[in-house]
């Protein structure tokens, strides 16, 4: 008999989790769902069950999802070539139509169906619904390696959140529904914009003054120079680790997004491994958590 099949052990686990469930009761927890976990059916079911359990425990979960690999697969299938500027994808009019179709029309509904299969009421949304999010054109700059001059990149319809209205999300929370949100939003200029899912999740969490924002990634969290997991960091600690090179590469923008979310009013942001089954529950409902917590 395994630990989880032992009734006494099950009771002990539930008892140990109770104080943490009470801590998050009626609190907003935003979960950014992405990475390889999205492509694994078993991990997808485990994630949906975790989200359902959060709702049943009195938490108000909000899911924001990405879908980069699925977008690229559809662009390839349709014969639409991707153009890059400074290593970043340019989103033209044809591409943004595909992005919206894949994110809001396909992936979003798959996640909704998984959560609903666990007995909860999930509803699929994007930034356009209820004027929840308005975007503005993102401005990116790079240093030209030849001239060492800063160059402004035109990435087309790549945006960033400019305005977030929490009215619809509050209404859904009172209605016992779980919002699942695709990072697509309109601009005041009438165009549709594709927004980085991490940035979008941070803006949603900030508008809600969420207790936690969880980033499900393909790594355990922030690692020290000995490649050991750092359990907790202040914003100042995180900035120091970026300066000394401990935090490097693709982890830098992830941590900077965490810092930005905290400045927007989020109480704590966690980077954790979405490939670990039930990592959301391990983070919220156990003593030691499951990733790196960044706090003010």
Swiss-Prot record:
Protein's pathway: Amino-acid biosynthesis; L-arginine biosynthesis; N(2)-acetyl-L-ornithine from L-glutamate: step 2/4
InterPro entries: AceGlu_kinase-like_sf, AcgluKinase_fam, ArgB, Asp/Glu/Uridylate_kinase, NAGK-C
Molecular function per GO: acetylglutamate kinase activity; ATP binding
EC number of this enzyme: 2.7.2.8
Catalytic activity: N-acetyl-L-glutamate + ATP = N-acetyl-L-glutamyl 5-phosphate + ADP
BP GO annotations: arginine biosynthetic process via ornithine; L-arginine biosynthetic process
Main location per the UniProt record: cytoplasm
Binding site for substrate: 67-68, 89, 194
Site (Transition state stabilizer): 32, 254
Top-level enzyme category: transferase
One Pfam family per UniProt: AA_kinase
GO CC annotations, alphabetized: cytoplasm
Subcellular localization, as worded in the UniProt entry: Cytoplasm
UniProt entry keywords in alphabetical sequence: Amino-acid biosynthesis, Arginine biosynthesis, ATP-binding, Cytoplasm, Kinase, Nucleotide-binding, Transferase
Reported function: Catalyzes the ATP-dependent phosphorylation of N-acetyl-L-glutamate.
NCBIfam families reported for this sequence: argB
Cross-referenced HAMAP family: ArgB
Family indicated by similarity: Belongs to the acetylglutamate kinase family. ArgB subfamily.
Official protein name in the record: Acetylglutamate kinase
């Amino acid at each position: 008999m395994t630990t989880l099949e032992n009734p006494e052990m099950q009771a002990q686990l539930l008892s140990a989790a109770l104080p943490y469930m009470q801590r998050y009761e009626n609190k907003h927890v935003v979960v950014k769902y992405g990475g390889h976990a999205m492509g694994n059916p078993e991990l997808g079911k485990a994630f949906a069950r975790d989200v359902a359990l959060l709702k049943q425990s009195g938490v108000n979960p909000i899911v924001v999802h990405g879908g980069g690999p699925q977008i690229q697969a559809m662009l390839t299938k349709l014969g639409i070539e991707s153009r890059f500027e400074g290593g970043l994808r340019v989103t033209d009019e044809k591409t943004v139509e595909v992005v919206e179709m894949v994110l809001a029309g396909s992936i979003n509904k798959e996640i909704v169906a998984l959560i609903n299969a666990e007995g909860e009421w999930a509803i699929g949304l994007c930034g356009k619904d209820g004027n929840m999010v308005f975007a503005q054109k993102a401005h990116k700059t790079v240093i030209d390696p030849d001239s060492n001059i800063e160059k402004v990149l035109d990435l087309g319809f790549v945006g960033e959140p400019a305005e977030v209205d929490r009215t619809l999300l509050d209404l859904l929370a009172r209605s016992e529904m779980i919002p699942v949100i695709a990072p697509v939003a309109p601009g005041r200029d009438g165009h549709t914009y594709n927004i980085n899912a991490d940035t979008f999740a941070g803006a949603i969490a900030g508008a809600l003054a969420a207790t936690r924002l969880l980033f499900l990634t393909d790594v355990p969290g922030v690692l020290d120079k000995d490649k050991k997991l750092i359990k907790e960091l202040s914003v100042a600690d995180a900035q120091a680790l970026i300066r000394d090179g401990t935090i490097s590469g693709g982890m830098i923008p992830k941590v900077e997004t965490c810092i930005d979310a905290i400045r927007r009013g989020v109480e704590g942001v966690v980077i954790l491994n979405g490939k670990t089954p039930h990592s959301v529950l391990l983070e919220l409902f156990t003593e030691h958590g499951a990733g790196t917590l960044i706090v003010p």
